[in-house]
Amino acid sequence: MKKVKVQDAVGLTLCHDITAMRDGFKGAAFKRGHVIEEGDVEKLLDLGKRTVFIWEENAGEIHEEDAARRMAAVAQVEGCHYTEPSEGKVLLMADTRGMFRVDTALLNQVNSIGDLTISTLPDHFPVEAGDRLASMRIVPLVTQETQILEAERLCQGKKLLDLRPYHPRKTGVIITGSEIYTGRIKDKFEPVVRAKLAHYPGEILGVTICDDDLNMIVDTAKGYLAQGADFLIFTGGMSVDPDDLTPTAIRQLGAEIITHGVPAQPGNMTLVAYLGDVPILGVPGAAISMPTTIFDVLLPQIYAGDRLTHEDLIRLGDGGLCRLCKPCHFPTCTFGRY
């Protein structure tokens, strides 16, 4: 790579994109590989470019675009594609819906290699097809190939980035509470749960309202399991009051309760359990009064096939406080980012 005055660069090949910013536009005015013409000189000067870099290949060096392609190659993600390099960077784009995962420890290692930079959406972020997930580039126009080789070594056999698509689930919904069962109070959980599950593939096998009767709750859950349910949602009866039977019913099913209570608000009293491979969520009343609770944070992980651990749920504390923005713009916010 050689630096030359623009007046002396006519007939030479540009080795980098040159960016223009004007009237809301930001993009490449000149692309790498462009052969500079007489008419380009004034345009380059207007962009503040008195000098440009002309490509001269040196052993052991790698150009920014080639480096970006090599960086993308170490982080191939099924269900995604990379753009062609532009202005020295490549973008990872989602081709499907799902939950984006990042090996943050490995990402920090790669970003500690000299000139390499990879920026991503947060780990556990729910994404839609067409979303931009990551950007990769080196800081200078060229770098030593040894830096790329080190990134390739670190990432070999590992998943730096991943997109886990949502899988269909058959869900049984069990609403508990004598006040609802007897008709004294109108149920408000069903429309909320249906609206939230509508964002994910699968079907709701049914919604059953149960009295505060342990056997009724357990038998209803067993009935859904017999129909092939692979996800159970319980609402109501999630507090620590002695007559709140939902946690007891879940235990009586034979499920392992991972936690009853999470360090996140709204939704502190959320219960997470597993009966074999069947996830079970106990959803507290905050889901009725708040547009977003920890229920919304956990659903993408369940539909993406993650098995939630106690450690996962403890980590919710950092980012677990909803700011109660009006209007709510979850998930493009701080809530549930861990």
Residue ranges, per PLM feature:
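C-terminal terminal segments
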Residues: 32, 84, 99-118, 125-128, ...
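Short, low-complexity N-terminal leaders and the immediately following helix N-cap/first helix
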Residues: 1-87
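Short glycine/threonine-rich loop/turn motifs
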Residues: 178, 205-332, 336
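Flexible, glycine/charged-enriched surface loops at secondary-structure junctions
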Residues: 54-55, 80-85, 143-145, 203-207, ...
